[in-house]
């Protein structure tokens, strides 16, 4: 099945379940940028619960800026702060040390635009997960109903402000988490959480994460 997805910053597990199950993906790069979404936000685990990490961005002043034109901000040394938070959260996880160099290399690359940064992170995560679903960036805003009527349009399906709905077909399969004795199981965090805690077995959670 062809799936339409938005750009996302270290996207949640549900997003990667869809990547795993898809035959091909088109990533929307011409929609209007939406604030307070996974496009520039991810959730990682901490001893006190989920921690949101938000990428500061710069727009061209228009209220409806295409996401492909949204630039990364240099404000406040956010990359260093985000990486410190990620390392602190997962340095004691079983697989962080094996993936750290690859993740760090992609994270600290030189990027001007948010979508390119997100795509680089997605690509390295897919490589570490062994996912080979082809992902193509859109060349224009897609009218799904007329252009891809058989596609599954999930461009607005994921939000950090709400839990994954059962009707979406996503099933949050429990797995080992570093802080679960303190916080209980935290569902649908960033793919980083699954990858660092389960390593190669993360694919099994992605495989079983959608209802038939």
Kindly give the residue locations of the regions a language model identified.
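Residues lining hydrophobic/aromatic ligand-binding pockets adjacent to catalytic sites
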Residues: 1-212
């Amino acid at each position: 099945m062809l799936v339409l997805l938005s750009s996302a910053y270290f996207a949640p597990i549900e997003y990667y379940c869809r990547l795993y199950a898809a035959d091909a993906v088109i990533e929307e790069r011409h929609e209007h940028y939406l604030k307070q979404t996974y496009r520039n936000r991810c959730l990682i685990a901490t001893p006190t619960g989920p921690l949101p990490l938000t990428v500061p961005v710069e727009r061209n002043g228009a209220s409806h800026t295409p996401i492909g034109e949204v630039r990364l901000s240099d404000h406040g040394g956010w990359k260093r702060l985000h990486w410190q938070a990620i390392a602190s959260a997962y340095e004691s996880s079983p697989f962080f040390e094996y993936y750290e160099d690859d993740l760090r290399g992609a994270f600290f690359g030189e990027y001007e635009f948010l979508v390119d940064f997100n795509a680089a992170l997605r690509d390295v995560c897919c490589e570490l997960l062994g996912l080979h679903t082809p992902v193509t960036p859109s060349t224009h805003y897609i009218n799904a109903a007329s252009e891809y009527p058989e596609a599954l349009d999930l461009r607005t399906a994921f939000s950090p402000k709400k839990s994954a709905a059962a009707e979406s077909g996503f099933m949050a399969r429990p797995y080992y988490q570093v802080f679960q004795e303190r916080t209980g199981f935290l569902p649908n965090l960033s793919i980083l959480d699954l990858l660092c805690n389960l390593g190669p077995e993360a694919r099994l959670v992605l495989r079983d994460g959608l209802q038939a």
